[in-house]
Amino acid sequence: MERLYKKLESYGKSDYYPFHMPGHKRNKASSAGDFAFERDITEISGFDNLHHAEGILKEAQENAAQIYGTKKCFFSVNGSTAALLAAVSASVSKGGRILVARNCHKAVYHALYLRDLLPVYVYPHEDKRLGINGGISARSVERYLEENQDVQAVLITSPTYDGVVSDIKEIAEVVHRHGIPLIVDEAHGAHFRFSDYFPVSAAELGADIVIQSFHKTLPSMTQTAVLHVCSDMVDVGKIKRFMGIYQTSSPSYILMASMDACMDKLQKDGKQMFREFTYNLEKARQRLLKCEKIKLIEASMLQGTGIYDFDRSKLLFSTVGTSINGHQLHEMLRDRYHIEMEMEAEKYALGIAAVGDTEEGFDRLCTAIEDIDAETELIPAAEESQENNSHARMKQLMTISQAMDAQQRRYSLEESIGKVSAEFAYLYPPGIPIIVPGEQITGQFVRNVRRYMEQGLEVQGLSDTSAETICVAARNESGQEEDSPAKE
């Protein structure tokens, strides 16, 4: 088949002159930066159109579907965000009800707002000492579906940001008994298909729609993702329609070529690449497991949290029981060793290993963690913070749409207790809300936000970037805020 990235390379070297978008006209001299302008084109003859793919882009998407063993694959240049928005919109009628895992990405909540959906939350298990969310159990999904017969779809995240995988096969069987589709946000699992060292992809276990971010764990550029249709329960026409709505009408050919090149490379060299990657990764993990204070988290440490499988490419370093926290570990790795981690949390720091990593890179990380481990002190259990980022069962008093569209008033965090939030607040990354518009603000929420800020963690979503105030929703016809008597 003709490869998009090769055709783009060839075209970039040609003498065709562009009297069309984009404005740089494939001329490097037009910019102060050295970008790949010669390959940045629009929908010109021979290069197809992502929103009406009939040629080279159709072939590229079909090739990706063949590699992953799915019925149909849609490229997304707006990341997994656009794919999640499209999946939810195509699966649930406007104003309908959906069962979602509470630890879903903020894009899912944005879909709830845009489609005025009514969420039913299923909560993950959690390890409170380590501060890590576990999996979603099929039993919980079954219970919520029995209690909410009008649910039109189920959406869960697996693997989580931390690498926790739920039992997708069993969950899919439960969901299908109720005659509805299962959507799996597998943004962090695009690499599963390429090595038995990793868990099995949801696309092979009965999920109906699977979303993957190529850019997270495969050699592809930022913003590149795919939506896989895996069963006949999915209305492909609706998926196509909503992908066209939520994606830009000017998709980047550089990004699409990046996805095509990624698939081509893995088809040709993937087995050898992943063989070397998993060898170096496992060697590093065995070395890191010898540290005595900074603990590399393994699946065996998360038993009892609903975990079914674990993605070992996620390098979680627990600081529980030590004199430092996750933020401090993150800062030490960055400032002293010039190692940038993916995320920091209260009690751990997270690094993502991927097929592009080198043996030298793993060695640098191991050496840095060993050095920090040697100088870190253990502290008595009684001195450990007992607070954790728990997904507390928040009381929903308004729908997300009602709260976000209502008249709003700003209060200090302490004054807002008992009122209805009109804003999201979440730790980013990973972008999982700790409060959702329409939910009642509690004292625990306020204490959590204060604690996160004190520890240097990044609280986003609030319009007040200092996180000192929050917008609340008016709840009566006059538009004035009604104080709720419930306080903590």
PLM region spans:
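N-terminal glycine-rich, Lys/His-bearing helix-loop that initiates the first secondary-structure elements
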Residues: M1-E38, Y426, P430, L462-S463, ...
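Conserved PLP-enzyme active-site core in the AAT-like
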Residues: L4-E9, S31, I67-T70, S80-S300
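Short, glycine-/Ser/Thr-/acidic-enriched flexible segments
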Residues: R26, Y161, K216-T217, D232-V234, ...
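Conserved N-terminal alpha-helix of the aminotransferase class I/II PLP-enzyme fold
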Residues: A36-G79
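Short glycine-rich or small-residue beta-strand-to-loop segments that form or flank ligand, phosphate
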Residues: F74-S76, V154-T157, L316, L350-A354
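Short, compositionally biased
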Residues: D116, Y121, E454-T465
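Conserved C-terminal alpha-helix-loop-beta "cap" of PLP-dependent enzymes
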Residues: K283-G461
